[in-house]
């Protein structure tokens, strides 16, 4: 099971006034593709930040993560460098503490996280929006098989995991079964607080 740790709230309460936009969903849903397109669309907006996750697995061309060893991750955690950290599929993941400064400055921070940290982050931050990105099971299976990433492990096992929890906790759900450009525009509207339906 996943281990999660979230940083304590500010002395005055939950960290704000900026927004924390959390993207969750099953492997193969296209989260990283939509995030990459959304980041490109928001690149000229200084009020929107896409922090790089710290991860204890090899870097991937599809993700903009900071790859570190398990020892480096442990040392950073012990030095309080993470706003939140979690374990999933045999790897450690974290978001840097810098996101707290961005949130306090009123910026929107957008991050791909595990659904296991949602409750802790909703408690620690004043303005949280959870976006669940999903796709039909056959599409998920095709995408996982096509990317053939060793860290994906057993595809059937991944697909058998329930994604209902993430959708139930989501403020917005994007069914990513069509054009990535179309769905990334939906995500950008959510990030900017404009709603998402066309």
Q: Can you annotate each of these PLM segments?
A:
Residues 23:
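Hydrophobic anchor at the beta1->P-loop junction of P-loop NTPases
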Residues 49, 53-109, 113-115:
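ATP-dependent small-molecule kinase phosphotransfer cores
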């Amino acid at each position: 099971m996943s281990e999660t740790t979230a940083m304590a709230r500010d002395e005055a309460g939950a960290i704000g006034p900026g927004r924390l936009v959390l993207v969750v969903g099953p492997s193969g849903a296209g989260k990283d593709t939509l995030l990459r397109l959304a980041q490109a669309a928001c690149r000229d907006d200084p009020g929107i930040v896409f922090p790089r996750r710290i991860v204890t697995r090899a870097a991937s061309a599809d993700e903009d993560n900071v790859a570190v060893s398990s020892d480096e991750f442990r040392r950073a955690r012990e030095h309080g460098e993470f706003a939140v950290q979690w374990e999933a599929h045999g790897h450690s993941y974290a978001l840097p503490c810098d996101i707290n400064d961005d949130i306090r400055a009123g910026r929107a921070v957008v991050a791909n996280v595990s659904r296991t940290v949602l409750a802790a982050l909703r408690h620690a931050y004043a303005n949280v929006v959870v976006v669940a990105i999903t796709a039909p099971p056959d599409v998920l299976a095709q995408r996982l098989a096509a990317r053939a990433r060793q860290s994906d492990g057993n595809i059937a096992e991944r697909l058998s995991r329930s994604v209902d929890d993430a959708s139930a906790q989501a403020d917005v759900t994007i069914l990513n079964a069509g054009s990535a450009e179309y769905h990334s525009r939906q995500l950008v509207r959510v990030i900017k607080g404009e709603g998402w339906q066309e």
